[in-house]
Each structure stands twice: as C-alpha cells, then as structure tokens.
C-alpha cells in the first residue's frame, strides 16, 4: 500500500461503509481545518483517481514533496505529487500468468453497549422524577420487562387495550441491544486479480483483470460494493526510429445500499439506532417485524444504487529524429460516468387485527434516477533534447 511510501504521507479512510474512499495528504494540514490533496500522476498522466486503481497493477509508487513537486508540475501540485507506474512486460520475458486473491474478515469495533431494558426504564423514570416529571414507563411495563427477562413472558410486547396497535416506546417489554441487531458480527471482503504479461524483441504487453467485493455491516438489507478493473499496457517499436505506446484502464464500481427514508430516519440509520429504547420490540406477537424497529426499511424497503464507470486511455507515438533528440505526440481520453437510482418503496406493518397499516414516511412509492458524466480530452506534442557532456547534462 501507499502507507509508508514516503515521509509525511497520511492516508485516512472516509468512514466504514463498503464504498468508503481514502483521503491522502502530504505534510498534514495545509490550512486552518483543511488538508490539500496531492496531485496523482499515473503513467505520466495527471489527475488519475487513486481510489479506482487496482493495487495489483501497480509496479512502483514514489512521492514528490514541497519545492521538488512545484518545480516539475508547477501550480498543479501545491500539495505534492504521488507518481504511480503500472506494470509492463519486460524484454525477453516469456508469457507469464499470475493470479492472487485476498479474503478479509471485518468486525465492528467501539459500538456502545446498551443497558438492559429494565435498567434503562428505571434510570429514565428517575431522570424525569429529578426534573419534577411523571414516569414514562408505568409499573405494568416494568413488570413485563422483568417477566420477559426471567423467561416467564415470551413476547416482546403486547397489544394495546384500546385501538388496533401494539405497545411501543413506553409500553413494550423487550430487551434488545440495537447495535447487535443492526450490525453483523463479521463481514467478508474478497479480491481476485489476474495478470498476463510478456514480450517479444520489439513489443511488450501487460493485461490485468481485477474483481473486488466488499460486504457491508448491516445484518438486514445487506449493503455491498463491487469493483471491476481492466488495464492494458502495450509498447511496440514499429521501426528503429518510431515507438507506439498504449496505456488503457477501465474501472466500474457499484454500491447497493438500503434507502435511508429520510423522513423517518433523518437520513442516517446510525442516528436512529442510538435513539432506540432497548424495550422496543423487534418482533410483534404476530411474528411480524415491528414498525418502530425500522428493520423493515432495511430488509424490505427500496434501494439506493450507484454505478461509476471510469475509462481512461492514452495513445502515444515517440519518434527518434537523431541521437539524443526525440519528439512525442500523445492523446488521452479521461471519462467518468455516474448513474444513480433511489427507490422509495411503500411498506406496511401488520396490526393485532391482521389488518395492514402503511408505515409513515414510506409513501408515496417513488423512483428517481440521475446521470452525470465528465469527459476530458488531452493532446500533447513536444520534443526533448538530452545531451551528456562528462559530468554535465543538458536537457531541453
């Protein structure tokens, strides 16, 4: 990895979601509360996306800092440069095929431990009493919590004596740790890489394929991330004075996650988990998942799906005009295409009577799609003259 590739190089993960990217900076903070990102240069092309490159395709990484970066790349690199060189075939190398894989198991850490429901209810009531308020949990609810915890009561809640509903916030008697309910104990990620390289007297090539799958931590309504990578590098001496180089890469990543139902969760399930009372039921006596748990939103609700396609390729001709004198012409296409869909699916909860009731903030049923694209075309033409005179070098 990049960590440790150079002094002062800091890499920070932006969250724990399967599609979380990484932020990179050199020398830490560059201003009050901010840290500028270094310029990424992949095979001589500026502005590559380091989060979409397959690490298995990388041959070497180097870091340029401070004045050295500005001297070469000018105002494009005020925060340093990370140079990435991808693999190529080597002259005289026979055809080589490589395959490797990696399986990773992850567990959430640092999750709060919730009080059991009876302890929570008593402390909650005491806090209200300290302020001169009435208790939120009555004695009947407290007795049922105790009975549920000692095993004499089997259901997590009971029906209200009036109306067609189950007792919830102040009346349910479950004993749930919502962090353990919402999150898996372990999630798995896997990565597979295939590389083919080779060379003849006049040409060399490298082709790399990569597949990366990351499972999320949701126990219900699994969130997941997939990325596919393709890279092809080719260099060929067409004549003794003309060389053709091609470098191309394509990546596609797809993130599929439950819709957050902003009106009900505030757009953040973590926000909801921290607010849930441990006495709330996961399952009602009729066997249906409760409305208040919000698990139905994860399990049966709509999905948010985002797909990013990123093609980039460079074609280059290098002509040797004379000893130490070359001319180069190249063209680069750099594109990014994003497609996102958001589905709000109307959900229903089962009532004690057997009737279904619409869950609040899940209607109307809706579907939205957005599409964004970015394209950049770069053409360069330049000449180089390189002359060595003893201990002196002239390069123009």
Task: Show where each model-derived region lies.
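Proline-centered flexible-loop/turn and helix-kink motifs
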Residues: 7, 275-279, 323
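Short secondary-structure capping/turn segments at boundaries of alpha-helices and beta-strands
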Residues: 71, 193-194, 314-316, 335, ...
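Short structured motifs
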Residues: 10, 191-193, 299, 314, ...
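Residue-level signature of outer-membrane beta-barrel architecture
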Residues: 86, 198-200, 236-237, 317-319, ...
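Solvent-exposed aromatic/hydrophobic patches embedded in short alpha-helical segments
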Residues: 39-42, 238, 312, 316
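Short, small/polar-rich motifs associated with maturation and membrane association
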Residues: 1-231, 243-245
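Surface-exposed loop/interface segments of Gram-negative outer-membrane beta-barrel transport/assembly proteins
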Residues: 91-175, 212, 216-312, 328-330, ...
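Short, well-ordered coil/turn residues that connect adjacent beta-strands
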Residues: 59-60, 240, 313, 323
């Amino acid at each position: 990895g990049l960590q440790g590739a150079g002094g002062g190089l800091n890499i920070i993960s932006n969250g724990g979601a399967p599609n979380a990217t990484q932020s990179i900076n050199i020398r830490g903070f560059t201003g009050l509360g901010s840290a500028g990102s270094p310029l990424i240069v992949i095979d001589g092309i500026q502005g590559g996306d380091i989060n979409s490159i397959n690490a298995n395709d990388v041959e070497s990484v180097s870091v340029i800092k401070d004045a050295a970066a500005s001297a070469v790349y000018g105002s494009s690199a005020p925060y340093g440069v990370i140079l990435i060189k991808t693999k190529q075939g080597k002259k005289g190398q026979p055809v080589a095929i490589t395959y490797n894989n990696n399986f990773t198991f992850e567990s959430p850490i640092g999750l709060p431990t919730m009080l059991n429901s009876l302890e929570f209810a008593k402390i909650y009531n005491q806090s209200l009493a300290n302020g001169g308020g009435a208790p939120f949990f009555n004695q009947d609810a407290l007795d049922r919590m105790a009975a549920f915890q000692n095993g004499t009561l089997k259901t997590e809640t009971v029906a209200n004596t009036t109306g067609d509903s189950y007792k919830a916030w102040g009346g349910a008697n479950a004993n749930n740790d919502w962090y353990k309910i919402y999150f898996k104990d372990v999630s798995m990620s896997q990565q597979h890489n295939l590389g083919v390289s080779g060379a003849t007297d006049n040409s060399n090539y490298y082709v790399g394929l990569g597949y990366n799958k990351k499972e999320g931590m949701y126990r219900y309504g699994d969130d997941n991330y997939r990325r596919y990578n393709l890279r092809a590098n080719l260099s060929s001496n067409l004549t003794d004075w003309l060389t053709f180089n091609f470098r191309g890469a394509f990546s596609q990543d797809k993130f599929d996650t439950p819709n957050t139902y902003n009106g009900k969760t505030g757009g953040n399930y973590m926000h909801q988990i921290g607010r849930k009372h441990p006495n709330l039921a996961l399952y009602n006596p009729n066997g249906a998942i409760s409305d208040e748990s919000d698990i139905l939103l994860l399990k049966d609700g709509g999905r948010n799906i985002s797909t990013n396609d990123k093609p980039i390729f460079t074609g280059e001709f290098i002509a040797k005009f004379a000893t130490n004198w070359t001319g180069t012409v190249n063209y680069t296409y750099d594109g990014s295409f994003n497609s996102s869909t958001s589905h709000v699916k109307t959900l229903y909860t089962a009532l004690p009577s057997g009737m279904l009731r619409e869950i609040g903030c899940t209607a109307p049923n809706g579907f939205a799609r957005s599409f964004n694209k970015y394209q950049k075309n770069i053409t360069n033409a330049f000449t180089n003259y390189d002359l060595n005179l003893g201990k002196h070098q002239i390069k123009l």
